[in-house]
A protein has these predicted regions:
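Active-site proximal loop and beta-alpha junction motif in alpha/beta enzyme cores
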Residues: 1-74, 80-277
Length: 277
C-alpha cells in the first residue's frame, strides 16, 4: 500500500461548492490502468485525474483522465483543476504558461492571477449533424425543430454533438430521454437575456450507464465557443454560465486571441490530504 497526495478541487466556481468537483492524485506513475479505473469508479466524481511524469521535454506534466466508467483523451475542467494542483506542488514553477500532456497531445494552460485557462484543442469532428443524427438529437432531448437554431458536431475528444437553442426558456426546460441518448453526448447553448451578467448559458448531457447532466463542462464550452465565434454569433470575449439546473453556478471565461480560443475559470481546493492505494 502506498500513500499519495490527494485533492478535490472546485472548478469554474466563484462560490464554494457551486462549480464542478475534480479529484486529483499525484505521483501516479506506478499505478496500473485497472487501478486508475477502479479509483475513479470509487470516487464517483465526473472525472478523476492522475498526475504523471511527462514523456516529452516540452510538457510540464502528463495526466490521465478517468470518468467512473472509462478513460477520456481530454476534458476541460480536469485540465484546469490538474494544472492548478501541479502549480501548487513544491518545486514546480511556470512563467504564466503550463504545458499539459494528455490523450490529445499537448495542451497549453495559461495562468493569470487566479484564472486558469486552457487553449481549446482542435475539433476531431465538426460540421452540421446529418438528418438522422439531428432527428436522434431532438428525440433524446425532447425538443422540436422550432426550438433549435442550428446543430453540429463539436467533438474535441469526448464526442459532443451541440445544439444552438432558440432561447434560455427552451434550454432550461429540457427533460432528456436518457434511454434515447444512449451512449451519445449532447451540449446545448442559448443566448442570455439582454442585460444579463453572462452572454450564453449551456447544459451538458452525457449518456452511458444511467446518464447524467454535467455541472460545468470545459470541453463543451471550448467546442461551442469555436462554433459560435467562427459563425460570428459570439463576440471574441464573453462570459458563459452552466449548472443552474443542478443548483450550481459555474462561470466560464471565453476569449479568442488570434487562432486560439481560451477557456478559463477559477480553481479552488476544497479537500486536501492523502489517499492510500
Amino acid at each position: 500500500m502506498s500513500d499519495h497526495a490527494y485533492w478535490q478541487v472546485d472548478v469554474f466556481a466563484r462560490q464554494a461548492f457551486k462549480g464542478n468537483p475534480l479529484a486529483v492524485i499525484a505521483d501516479a506513475d506506478h499505478l496500473s490502468d485497472a487501478m486508475m479505473a477502479q479509483i475513479a469508479n470509487w470516487t464517483n466524481l465526473s472525472e478523476t485525474t492522475f498526475l504523471l511524469r511527462p514523456t516529452t521535454p516540452e510538457a510540464s506534466y502528463r495526466v490521465r483522465i478517468f470518468t467512473p466508467a472509462h478513460e477520456l483523451p481530454f476534458a476541460g475542467h480536469p485540465t484546469l483543476g490538474t494544472a492548478s494542483v501541479w502549480a501548487s506542488l513544491p518545486g514546480n514553477s511556470h512563467n504564466g504558461t503550463i504545458i499539459q500532456e494528455c490523450g490529445v497531445g499537448l495542451v497549453r494552460v495559461k495562468v493569470e492571477d487566479e484564472l486558469f485557462s486552457f487553449a481549446a484543442p482542435p475539433r476531431k469532428k465538426s460540421g452540421r449533424l446529418n438528418d438522422a443524427e439531428y432527428t436522434q438529437a431532438l428525440a433524446a432531448l425532447n425538443l422540436t425543430s422550432e426550438m433549435v437554431l442550428d446543430a453540429a458536431w463539436g467533438d474535441n475528444g469526448p464526442g459532443w454533438q451541440v445544439l444552438h437553442l432558440r432561447d434560455q426558456t427552451v434550454l432550461r426546460g429540457i427533460k432528456p430521454d436518457w434511454q434515447a441518448i444512449g451512449e451519445a453526448k449532447y451540449g446545448v447553448v442559448a443566448a442570455c437575456a439582454e442585460g444579463s451578467e453572462t452572454q450564453f448559458e449551456l447544459r451538458a448531457f452525457a449518456g452511458g450507464g444511467q446518464g447524467y447532466e454535467d455541472p460545468v463542462t470545459g470541453s463543451l464550452n471550448a467546442s461551442i465557443a469555436q462554433w459560435l465565434i467562427e459563425r460570428e454569433i459570439a463576440p471574441s470575449r464573453y462570459l458563459a454560465s452552466q449548472g443552474a439546473a443542478l443548483g450550481r453556478d459555474g462561470r466560464i471565461v471565453v476569449e479568442s486571441e488570434g487562432n486560439t480560443i481560451w477557456i478559463g475559470g477559477l480553481v479552488t481546493p476544497r479537500i486536501t490530504g492523502t489517499i492510500s492505494i
